[in-house]
């Protein structure tokens, strides 16, 4: 059973890596800067886009929080306390919720989002068709 949990976690981690690399390429930020965070608008935008599309292709807030915490720690097998994961997951949810406002505020953000959406459709066609949610509207 533990092997199947590790296998699923590795798949989610691989999805995370592929999508985050693409977002970083589109937003012109470094992956380590996105992981560790920054107040630069380009990094904030990249984080919002990453969370938005990771959620759309099936990762939960907890999945994203755990992967980020493990990447910061440098150990993909580390199991942090659940309270810390849940606290980080709340921040992930705030980023997910801020997507609509960023689209309203920035045409460039919409263009970047469109490029990532096209990438997801191509890269994760099966998952995209089964898990893609509607764009949030306000």
Predicted stretch roles:
Residues 1-138:
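Basic, alpha-helical nucleic-acid-binding regions used in initiation and control of genome expression
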């Amino acid at each position: 059973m533990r092997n199947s949990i590790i296998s699923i976690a590795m798949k989610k981690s691989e999805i995370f890596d592929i999508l985050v690399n693409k977002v970083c390429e589109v937003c012109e930020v470094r992956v380590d800067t996105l992981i560790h965070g920054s107040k630069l608008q380009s990094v904030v935008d990249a984080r919002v886009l990453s969370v938005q599309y990771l959620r759309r292709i099936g990762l939960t807030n907890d999945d994203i929080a755990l992967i980020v915490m493990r990447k910061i720690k440098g150990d993909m097998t580390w199991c942090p306390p659940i309270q810390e994961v849940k606290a980080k997951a709340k921040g992930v949810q705030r980023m997910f919720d801020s997507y609509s406002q960023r689209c309203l505020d920035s045409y460039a953000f919409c263009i970047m989002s469109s490029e990532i959406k096209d990438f997801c459709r191509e890269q994760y066609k099966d998952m995209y068709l089964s898990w893609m949610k509607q764009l949030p509207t306000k």
